[in-house]
Design a protein with these regions (language model features):
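Extracytoplasmic metal-acquisition and chelation regions
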Residues: 20-331
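Sec-dependent N-terminal signal peptides of Gram-positive bacterial secreted proteins and lipoproteins
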Residues: 4-23
Length: 331
């Protein structure tokens, strides 16, 4: 937090010395919307398609992880000068609170996506390696994990992996953008209606897949950012780590548990997430013969995905193709 306070002060000094011309800024003639991660950036692009007076800026550059992101002075200036700032509101956005507290008026122009939907806290996943497993190897009662202290509850950030949440967020953002630019409200609403139809079609696709599933449990040899998707379509899940935990080495007990789970249920695929080194999944696959497949949390695009301008819908349909194999759908 000391580093962030320094950057906020530095941003203020730079703005005074050289002005803010190099940073997109809100003005009477245009609207600047800033997001931390990719999904709301893409939603806003869909809502404002065809509007020449809207600039959308995503702070997280392609290939970067949101959980290790540190804002630059230019990022701070963009947040302080924008008309609307959209962030997730989970653990990886802790820096946002400090920035908003130090930026008069910024909080009123900001929205947390976890406040727009029924967000859940990171779950205790059977067999997964939790922080407690490293910090308290000999702790006695596993039930303590099921009721964590309220001071340590962490939202599962990946709310957009459920298309229903994507629809709710898109509708809410449309309303906010319409209030910023009433003259173009009809355009924004028409765009939103068209996009909601596409999201509904994605939902139909996922429902169809899960209804035909031969297997109903997904095993992630990795972190687990797909809680909302699994809950939405009634899928069970096991993973090496909950949410996007900071841990990178699973316990021996976790590895044994996942290997036995795959063998017992004859699960055909071990799943990983984007930007993973796949080491854990490979170790499980070596023991079970299951294939390794990758799913995408959509929190950010890789440099290649950004270069081809893949959308949220593109990435989610790729996830659907992976699910077809992982769930044993034959049609």
């Amino acid at each position: 937090m000391k580093k962030l306070a320094y950057l906020i002060a530095l941003a203020a000094i730079l703005c005074q010395l050289i002005g803010c011309a190099s940073v997109p800024a809100a003005s009477d003639d245009g609207i600047l919307i800033v997001t931390t991660v990719f999904p709301p950036y893409d939603f806003v692009r869909e809502i404002t398609d065809g509007a020449d007076n809207v600039t959308v800026l995503q702070l997280l550059k392609p290939g970067m992880e949101s959980h290790t992101f540190d804002p630059t002075p230019a990022d701070i200036l963009a947040v302080q000068n924008c008309d609307l700032f959209i962030y997730t509101g989970g653990e990886s956005d802790q820096w946002v609170t400090t920035l908003l507290d130090a930026s008069p008026g910024a909080e009123e122009r900001s929205v947390r996506m976890v406040d727009l939907v029924d967000a859940v806290t990171e779950d205790h996943i059977d067999g997964a390696t939790h922080r407690h497993d490293h910090d308290h190897e000999d702790d006695e009662d596993e039930h303590d994990h099921d009721a964590p202290d309220s001071d340590h509850l962490e939202y599962d950030e990946h709310v957009w992996t459920d298309p229903h949440n994507a629809m709710i967020i898109t509708e809410a953002l449309c309303g906010m953008i319409c209030s910023l630019d009433e003259d173009s409200a009809m355009l924004y609403r028409d765009n939103t209606d068209a996009y909601l139809e596409k999201l509904s079609a994605l939902d139909d696709t996922l429902h169809s897949l899960t209804e035909q599933a031969s297997y109903r449990t997904l095993v992630f040899g990795d972190r687990f950012p797909m809680r909302y998707l699994c809950d939405a379509y009634g899928l069970g899940y096991r993973a090496a780590f909950p949410g996007c935990a900071a841990e990178s080495e699973p316990s021996a007990a976790t590895m044994i548990y996942l290997i036995e789970k795959v063998r017992e249920e004859q699960i055909p695929a071990i799943l990983t997430i984007e930007m993973s080194n796949r080491k854990i999944a490979q170790a499980i696959a070596d023991e079970t013969g299951a294939q390794i497949l990758g799913m995408h949390s959509c929190h950010n695009r890789t440099t290649d995905e950004a270069a081809t301008d893949k959308t949220y819908l593109d990435l989610m349909y790729e996830n659907a193709a992976v699910l077809k194999i992982a769930l044993g759908v034959t049609e």
